[in-house]
Swiss-Prot record:
Name of the protein: Prostaglandin-H2 D-isomerase
Recorded GO MF terms: fatty acid binding; prostaglandin-D synthase activity; retinoid binding
Source organism (scientific name): Equus caballus (Horse)
InterPro entries: Calycin, Lipocalin, Lipocln_cytosolic_FA-bd_dom
Disulfide bonds: 89-189
């Protein structure tokens, strides 16, 4: 009896360690030698993947938006996004503050009050950037952590290879094919805002 109990406890501990190890591996690494000055400027939000219920409900009506990244005095960013909402252009600005090594930032969600960590996982600065956003769960979200992968591109029509790179990245973060969306282009709200 003691031997089977010990074996059972050993399997449980291995399972727990396996889960912890899997969660740790799920956090993507940062862009090596991230160069903030090259990341500045205009980007198009071309692809998204998320586990949030809001995203699942709205993903069919989302369209591409523009985001302008500008530096702040503390080494962070002002991220100003302009998007189409209910047939009107809406602009929102988030203050991304440094939150660790270069390429890691955080902001507080104006809607939920949660702190989100944003990581620039990969970028070539001239064509695309892959970002990963994570926020610890709160009771208001049903106990589920918020996760999102984002594809930024410098042009409205990213190359198929860039889209494939984003799909592979999103799947590596645990998103399923149906959670990955490439946002359709629109001619509305695409003018440059600073």
């Amino acid at each position: 009896m003691a031997a089977s109990h010990t074996l059972w406890m050993g399997l449980v501990l291995l399972g727990v360690l396996g889960v912890l190890q899997t969660r740790a591996q799920a956090q993507p690494s940062l862009q090596p030698n991230f160069q903030q000055d090259k990341f500045l400027g205009r980007w198009f939000t071309s692809g998204l993947a998320s586990n949030s219920s809001w995203f699942r409900e709205k993903k069919k009506v989302l369209s591409m938006c523009t985001s302008v990244v500008a530096p702040t005095a503390d080494g962070g960013f002002n991220l100003t996004s302009t998007f189409l909402r209910k047939d009107q252009c809406e602009t929102r600005t988030l203050l991304l503050q440094p939150a660790g090594p270069p390429g890691c930032y955080s902001y507080t969600s104006p809607h939920w009050g949660m702190v989100h960590e944003v990581s620039v996982v990969e970028t070539d600065y001239e064509e695309y950037a892959l970002l990963y956003t994570h926020a610890e769960s709160t009771k208001g979200l049903g106990g589920q952590d918020f996760r999102m992968a984002t594809l930024y591109s410098r042009v409205q029509s990213p190359r198929p290879e860039v889209k494939e790179k984003f799909s592979t990245f999103a799947k590596a973060q645990g998103f399923t094919e149906d959670a990955i969306v490439f946002l359709p282009q629109t001619d509305k709200c695409m003018e440059e805002h600073n």
